[in-house]
Amino acid sequence: MTAPASKLLQPITVGPLELKNRIMFPPLTTGYEERDGSIGERSLAFYERLARGGVSYIVIGDVAPVMTASPTPKLATDAQIPTFKALADAVHKHGAKVALQLFHPEYDVPGVGRMVMGSMAAAKAAQEAKAAGDEETFAAKMAESNEIRNQAYAKLHHDMQHFVNEASVEQLIQIKEAIAASAARAQQAGIDAIEVHGDRLVGSLCSAILNQRTDEYGGSFENRVRYALEVVAAIKEAAPQLMVEYKLPVIMENPDGTPRGKGGLQPDEACEFAKLLEGAGIDMIQVAQANHTGNMGDTIPPMGAMPYNWTLPVAERVKALVSVPVATVGRVISVEAGEKILEDGAADIIAYGRSLMCDPDIALKAATGEPIRECLNCNKGCVDAIQNRKYISCVLNAENGDEATVAIKPGEGDKKIAVVGGGIAGLEAARVAAKRGYDVTVYEASDHLGGQIVLAAAPPRKDEIMRSVEYYEKILPGLGVKVELNHAATAEDLNAADAAIVAVGAHDVVIPVPGADSEKVVSSWDVLAGKAELTGRVAVIGGGLVGTETAEYLLQHGCEVAIVEMLDKIAAGESETILPLIMSDFAEHNVEQHVKTRLTAITDEGVEAIRTTEDGAEEPVKIACDYVVMAVGSKANAFDLDGVTVPVTCVGDCSGERTADIASAIRTAYHAANEL
């Protein structure tokens, strides 16, 4: 336990709203909405869970004011008002306020005017034809509009480099009017606030990089921000009862001093714009990373890519210039970090995005001093899901995304539970079983907890993953869980309990080729554990997640590396936000990548393999090396159940299912313990 927070829990007035604390959930694309864009059961359960956890202000991300193929929530017609009223009611029930982040998705493409305008133009022509009684033209134009709209998903999210005509002033007015109309509907639904999405279309107009217009919306700084201020004014006129917030995207700075993000405003311009926003009646400003185009890792960086709170310096500058509350967002992962930001006066409100997905009870725990489950910034369940058009979830939180149906059940009487294995699956099983009121003992054969997580934390930028283990080390004693290290569990140990969960993990494997028993062959696990110190030139067999991360580890320790992979690319399955960092590292160190290549033998000189060429032929390959590292997967460990008389459930890698990742380990353990 730590000391309860004080600053984070102080109320704050934002425009017409009184927020009960300084903790907000910023806008995130979730994928939870229904196909028609309405707020369904999954969305309601997710946002209500955040409110129940004590968050004071929740922003619903990417709400479209028009019907579109873009997979986002939509408030485009009066018929959609009831679902948003249900959302407002669910959040208000727990004392929180809710905002909608409005943006126009059919125009979410790089550059000013790089927008799909055909659907709107065709729909307008269709309505004109209908008014004139021309049913044939009406049908043809509606078909054309629908066809373009159906293609919008691909155009907006997969083919981000196409160029279309610059938007006309009339079209910009139509967009502004649609946003204002949606704000008016939000007011009718009982929503508390509107957040103007200052990136995307609005941000591209503000950007000196992207805005090449020569009319009243281009050229000078005043012209470039004109449209954004007009949108703010239109919202305030259409929904005068609502608080209006502006998300201010800024080009930040990478650790090496280079600009980070495409589009957006430079810091000096952002500060000037903040003063104009205050003059226009904005009630709150959220300073964020700009990323009008490109990899989402620019906006939501993975572990190790950026310092904690990297947007804070600009937020602090903005706060010094305006009197309205300023929020900061970006890798604030702990209660202590949020407290310090507020104590230093650098911001007024702390946005915990991924962190609240990981632990929705941050506010409640801040009041008691209970440790929170800190986000790893791995991006595996959240950002990667967004980029792959799936609904988001947190790898550490088995309930996230399924709040409507998944929760820890009350226990069924007094039970003793034996958990065999102190890796991540065993620790999660112990937590859930203890939360249900059971008497839990964890048996770990080694002298430490964490299992394969300890290995996963060894490569460059990956040390943050150890926070997942540290969380359990903090909370399990308070839940009454007994942990016995250096204790290989026996049948007697299990039989002393009422039920057992076995989470003994897996072991690495070796490809059985000639020479595989050579002293020059070592396992990736031994390398990452520090048991094998290699020098010189190393061939890593296997270019999957473990192989590429082991290669990075070896580069960090001064080795030359060649990777041999059977598939046609390396790092298959790696986070799309982490992959560019790996490939940059490999390019810098001239890592050889032998893809579509199968190991056949290990010799004194190195390795021999067969490569499949582009035309399907096979050719021999010889790669000279001093050491060979096997990184070709793992096989489930077996636990001797001879003599065990109590019910046993296997979870994680030893379950026989191909889990091999932290999310699967957590979820199999959670559900197994929840069914005891």
What are these regions (language model features)?
Residues Q10-I12, L44-A45, C271-E272, P313-A315, ...:
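A generic local structural motif
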Residues V322, G345-A346, L479, D517, ...:
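Short, structured coil segments at secondary-structure junctions
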Residues D439-L479, A551-L599, S655-R658:
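Rossmann-like dinucleotide-binding cores of NAD(P)H-dependent redox enzymes
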Residues V607-R611:
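SH3/SH3-like beta-barrel fold
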